[in-house]
């Protein structure tokens, strides 16, 4: 299976055989409560991600993050106090047949009732942006998920981005795009009216998700991209390694990067953009001169 992964892809190998489903579900609320479930609930409460009457499309890629997210949503539905509905949607963007079957088998074992649909995104993204197809692929996949969520009458689309994805995005924008912009816990779609993206794994560290999956005995989809399997290099992996190396010299650097987006002092920046309009620190001087 590792032959299907890209050169920079992390291969997550289970510790043992698959554990019984009930044991896996119990571990979310017990063994991994502090590191996964509690942070899932905190993000939902802090950012009001799940509200009365919501119909949430939970995006299932088959990777470690989306599988855990799906199971936690099922537990929230079972034990929570808010009335909401769930749809589990899984897209095949051009997986190898073995990868597609692994996705189906895992979801059947975990009793995640996915609605699987096809989209030839990998091939199209590679043709449009062959040098670096990842960005184009992500946009196309997002659009396909939006379409499916809308088709099912959902008002929210849940994605499995976690804490490490958030800080890596912040650093990618800073170092590669020259801007300060992070990944938000929720945002309204600009192209699909009435649909909101939510990210309930916002506070959960990737290492906690990996430990949960390995202990469960589940072999998740690792890098299932048939395009990445032929490519070398990925800026996100470089940023991930950079943050790790910074952690050797700066205490809790990950938390500092995360908190930076909560503590932006507009009086001390040269410029910013809000609602599509550019602003400059010079604007206040022009007002004073009038």
Q: Model-derived features: where do they sit?
A:
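ATP-dependent adenylation/nucleotidyltransferase module used to activate substrates
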Residues: 2-172, 176-179, 184, 207-215, ...
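Short, basic, helix/turn surface patches
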Residues: 138-152, 186-192, 243-260
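The feature marks non-catalytic terminal segments
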Residues: 218-290
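Short C-terminal domain-edge/linker segments immediately following a structured domain
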Residues: 116-122, 147, 187-192, 229-233, ...
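Short, solvent-exposed coil/turn elements at secondary-structure transition points
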Residues: 92-94, 120-122, 189, 203, ...
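Catalytic subdomain that performs nucleotidyl-dependent activation
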Residues: 85-86, 164-238, 242-245
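Mobile, glycine- and charge-enriched loop segments
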Residues: 112-131, 191, 195, 268-271, ...
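Electropositive phosphate-/nucleotide-binding environments in soluble metabolic enzymes
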Residues: 30, 34, 97, 139, ...
């Amino acid at each position: 299976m590792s032959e299907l992964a890209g050169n920079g892809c992390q291969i997550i190998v289970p510790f043992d055989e698959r554990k019984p489903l009930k044991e896996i579900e119990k571990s979310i609320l017990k063994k991994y409560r502090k590191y996964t479930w509690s942070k899932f609930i905190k993000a939902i409460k802090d950012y009001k991600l799940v509200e009365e009457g919501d119909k949430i499309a939970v995006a299932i890629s088959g990777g470690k993050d989306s599988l855990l997210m799906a199971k936690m949503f099922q537990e929230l539905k079972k034990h929570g106090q808010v009335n909401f509905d769930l749809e589990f949607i899984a897209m095949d963007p051009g997986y190898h047949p073995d990868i597609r079957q692994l996705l189906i088998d895992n979801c059947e074992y975990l009793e995640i009732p996915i609605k699987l649909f096809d989209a030839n995104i990998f091939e199209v993204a590679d043709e449009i942006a062959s040098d670096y197809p990842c960005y184009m692929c992500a946009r196309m996949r997002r659009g396909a998920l939006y379409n499916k969520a809308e088709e099912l009458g959902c008002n929210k689309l849940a994605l499995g981005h976690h804490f490490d994805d958030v800080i890596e995005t912040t650093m990618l924008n800073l170092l590669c795009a020259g801007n300060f912009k992070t990944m938000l816990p929720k945002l309204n779609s600009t192209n699909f009216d009435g649909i909101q993206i939510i990210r309930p794994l916002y506070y959960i560290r990737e290492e906690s998700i990996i430990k949960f999956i390995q202990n469960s005995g589940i072999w998740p989809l690792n890098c299932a991209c048939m395009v990445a399997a032929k490519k070398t290099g990925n800026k996100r992996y470089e940023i991930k390694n950079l943050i790790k190396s910074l952690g050797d010299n700066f205490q809790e650097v990950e938390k500092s990067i995360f908190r930076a987006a909560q503590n932006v002092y507009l009086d001390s920046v040269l410029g910013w953009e809000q609602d599509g309009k550019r602003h400059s620190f010079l604007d206040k001087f022009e007002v004073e001169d009038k």
